[in-house]
A protein has these predicted regions:
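N-terminal accessory/interface modules of nucleic-acid-binding and processing proteins
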Residues: 1-294
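Non-Sec secretion/translocation targeting segments of pathogen effectors
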Residues: 1-4, 8, 289-293, 297-302, ...
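Generic structural signal for well-ordered beta-strand positions
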Residues: 304-306
Length: 339
């Protein structure tokens, strides 16, 4: 099938197109067994036909989709590329909508097209290149761990927890993880550590004991850890709470968008923090979210849009702020999520 892009009509407004993207992202996440999954330690970031690599959430979603569908080569083509090169999509193939700098576009994996049949040698070379190309160097993979071991983070790390039970204590500004020797793989330790760092960025969020809010916060931590893992080349697997939020992800694109945007803010802050530390630039201890601009969606159904929730701690000024914060922190000393 030779496809043509349709760009007019009520179902092709930017808002509607983006809603479809997050609906698809929710379905991809709900079907996943992990956020970053590599084969024998080697994995290439999804890319387009010209070799340009996707990044961030888009790369994560295409990576998960490749594993969910069993695609052998993580190369994705948009309609313009396929039409320009006379590539036809297979019958019944379903596109994945993604958000790019040019807006929303539909992409197909190269395995969904006639390219492998028309150009077997070129396709074989693509597969070989994917096997040979390690997604990230081991030096990059060890970036976060080396900074912790050398006490370069302003946030303290205490190795007194159990595997899969990372937590963050706001009272003493400490991330708690298990000793690295207790993990079967180093990736598990790095996942716990990055989850603790994401919790650290979320410390100024209002604490709520509502079950749905706790699950949402756990999902944000999980996705944020996945984005950090994608950057530094370690696997992030499933979480124990996934069965509770998978149905919500499949059916509520606003919820999916809210948690993804929150995870992006946290992971971007951590990656920027690590990058500057690696370059020897001094960093403050303010690894939190107060300077970010969240989206205006009430995903919890509590009558408060997300931006008001995120900024709520900043609305208390003067002497009452310290009192309120101390009461909050004494009641919720740890943000603690289990896998």
């Amino acid at each position: 099938l030779l496809l043509k892009a349709k760009t007019d009509g009520r179902w092709h407004t930017q808002e509607h197109l983006e809603k479809n993207v997050y609906k698809e992202y929710g379905s991809i996440l709900a079907a996943s067994k992990g956020l970053t999954v590599s084969d024998n330690g080697n994995e290439s970031v999804p890319m387009d036909m010209s070799g340009h690599k996707y990044s961030g959430t888009t790369a994560m979603m295409l990576n998960i989709a490749s594993h969910n569908q069993g695609y052998e080569v993580p190369v994705f083509l948009n309609l313009a590329t396929m039409n320009a090169n006379g590539i036809r999509v297979n019958e019944n193939a379903v596109a994945i909508p993604v958000i790019t700098k040019n807006g929303v576009e539909n992409v197909y994996n190269i395995d969904q097209t006639d390219y492998p049949m028309k150009h077997p040698q070129e396709y074989s070379n693509m597969k070989l290149n994917q096997v040979l190309e390690s997604r990230l160097s081991s030096e990059n993979k060890d970036a976060i761990e080396s900074l912790v071991n050398n006490n370069r983070f302003t946030t303290k790390t205490s190795f007194d927890s159990s595997v899969g039970s990372a937590s963050y204590s706001a009272i003493d500004n400490t991330i708690h993880v298990a000793p690295v020797g207790e993990y079967d793989k180093k990736d598990g330790f790095l996942q716990d550590l990055s989850e603790g760092l994401v919790m650290r960025t979320r410390k100024s969020e209002p604490v709520s004991s509502r079950f749905e809010n706790i699950l949402k916060e756990g999902l944000i931590v999980h996705l944020g850890s996945g984005l950090v893992g994608q950057k530094y080349g370690y696997d992030v697997g499933e979480t124990a709470g996934s069965k509770f939020w998978k149905e919500r992800l499949k059916n509520d694109p606003n919820y999916t968008k809210a948690v993804i945007k929150a995870a992006e803010r946290s992971s971007d802050k951590i990656i920027d923090y690590v990058d500057k530390l690696q370059k020897g630039q001094s960093q403050s201890s303010n690894l939190d979210m107060r300077s970010t601009t969240p989206i205006d969606i009430d995903v919890d159904g509590n009558g408060i849009v997300e931006s008001d929730e995120n900024l709520a701690p900043d609305k208390k000024q003067g002497a009452d702020e310290e009192k309120d914060n101390n009461q909050e922190e004494s009641h919720h000393q740890h943000r603690h999520f289990h896998r």
